[in-house]
Amino acid sequence: MAFPSTKNNFIAQDFFPTVAKFKSTKQFFDCVIIDPPFFSTTPKGKVDLENDSARLINKVRPLINNGGTLIAINNALYVSGQEYMQTLEGLCKDGYLSIRELILVPDDFIGYNPIGKPITDPAPFNHSTKIAILDVRRK
């Protein structure tokens, strides 16, 4: 997967108003990367990756072109890899998403030496930062 990495190809804005604007103007994208904080509350909406990551994925899914890609990242420490996989598999049941690949965090990127066991088991991922590449199909 190769996407040109020029600044004009990336949008970093407040999630909820931006998604609403794109939906109302019928803007579609080949690839969406969703990497929210694990928890945030603003007057515009709430992000809670521990309890409701599926809702955020479902908000961006309609913005992705048929055959496009969604890179979904969940870095909530208290969400195990298995729990996140169950969420993703549940989202894939209707056939509009499918899991293409899980991306493991490289050892040299983690930035610390693990001491003891993680808070939750990250398997099938190798780190609490859980990254999945999903293929998107539209009606």
Region roles according to the model:
Residues V19-A20, S40-P43, G81:
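Short acidic/glycine-rich loop or secondary-structure boundary segments that cap or lie
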Residues T69-K139:
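C-terminal catalytic and target-recognition region of SAM-dependent MTase-like enzymes
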Residues D14-F16, F38, A76:
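Active-site-proximal loop/turn and secondary-structure-junction residues that shape catalytic pockets
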Residues K23, I57-R61, E89:
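A structural alpha-helix within SAM-dependent methyltransferase catalytic domains
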Residues M1-I33:
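S-adenosyl-L-methionine
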Residues I64-N66:
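Helix-to-beta-strand junctions that scaffold the AdoMet/dcAdoMet cofactor pocket
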Residues A12, F29-K59:
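Mobile active-site "lid"/loop adjacent to the S-adenosyl-L-methionine
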Residues K23-S24, K44-V47, Y84-M85:
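Short amphipathic alpha-helical segments
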